[in-house]
Amino acid sequence: RSTLFPYTTLFRSQPLDVGSGKTVVAGLVAAEVAQADFQTAIMAPTEILATQHAKTLDELLSPFGVSVALLTGRVKGAQRRQLLDNLANGDINVVVGTHALIQEKVAYHKLGFVVIDEQHRFGVKQRQALLQKADHMPHLLSMTATPIPRSLALTLYGELDISILDELPAGRQPIVTKIWSPASAPKLYETIDHELAQGRQAYVICPLIDDNPDNDKKSVEAEYHKLAKTMFRHRQVGLLHGKLPPEEKAAVMQQFADGELDMLVSTTVVEVGVNVPNATVMLIENADHFGLSQLHQLRGRVGRGQHQSFCHLMLSGHDKPSQRLREIEKSQDGFYLAEVDLKLRGPGEIYGRAQHGALSLKIASLSDTPLIARAQTEAERFVKEGRDLLQYNHLARAVSRYQRLTILN
């Protein structure tokens, strides 16, 4: 609270491990903002995620008189007009939505706090458009459930304050992670069916949508038909991938969340998805073709309830498991795995090619966290002393280019 009020504008990045409760953190801040008679806007990358956030926040905040509304493309007609009126006159304290939050007709009464969930999923212009809905620069919280190394966080988000949550809610059991070879598939399917027989649910993740004769990766279409017609023909099996129409994707995901499906065969579209506490099994086919961070994100879809959860990593062939698979088998610490990923793949691959030039440091290495932290401290002192960056033309140009890549406002 002391960070927010009275007049200091908050710019904070919040990298969290999967399942660590980031929505609750945003909700607690939103409650403080509402108490100060300002509004909060929370923008999520998908309608499914926005709906989940709105439900969670409404349950958390409505007992305290904080009103929460959901604005997505599905809200139409009279319901939409009424919601927009309530938002403009201040009757809504917290609005959660997708890109609908930045449409021209959407007006806020007193927007004071902006939360961008999984900010790397939005373009710079989209993030700017939401911030510009406020009369004055609002507080900003950028959240991601993708753990990144501290050195990378300092480099990428040096202009923001950083809060890292690396603890899970109390009572969460560790997820049992195991590597399997294709020869062990029948035994694995029996293990999964045993879980389903107890009323639990399972994800099966494939790297491709359609079969590709040029490689041996499993496609979600072929795997769905195989599982639904053979080993799990007595179960309710659903199919999900990015080529499905948005309405169909949302309907399938909702069926799974409501317990109408026992198994969901999907691509990585579930990497950032709804919270299904009853899902206790994650099977990742061709696991050796995924990066560490993505494997950890997918594993985080289970282990959210009271029951023991399992993550099964199926190899593509009979070769020995790679180092990254061994690392994820033995550790559930997302930030440790991010450090390992940094060493194995390098910063450009982790954060994306668009950022690679900005991360090519001339002197330091991104594995040298103490040096980067010291450099950040010195840079802050340089600015506080009123030193003129323009005296150093080459550095000024580099900083300007870097800011265009990373700055949110």
Language-model regions, residue ranges each:
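Single conserved hydrophobic/aromatic residue that forms the stacking wall/gate
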Residues: 1-9
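C-terminal accessory region of SF2 helicases/translocases
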Residues: 306, 310, 318-409
